[in-house]
């Protein structure tokens, strides 16, 4: 199977796979119903100013959960957390939880709405970081 091949499975009951196994090496996005699972990407920071981490359409998604890993590349420090974002069309609400630090928090997070776009931003504690971001978004 190549990257451009499409496999569609439609079933009214449970589906199981035994042989051959399926290995998915790289999938940027999977949508099941109104839930989208996405690799947002990797961002590099070089200052302590607020940085855009992600943006999504508020007419498509009501909420999102992020898994975020921040690596301070200068001091070899690490920060891993989950972030939940919810909006009512006018205001974005955000909370960080399940946070682990090798020393201290490396980034604070915020969210805002402009028009029909919800922006998630991060403000680094130290200037040189690599940020890896994964998102699960739930439809309106």
Segment roles from a protein language model:
Residues 21, 28, 70-72, 124, ...:
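A broadly conserved detector of short glycine/acidic/proline-rich loop/turn motifs that flank catalytic sites
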Residues 95-140:
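Low-complexity intrinsically disordered segments
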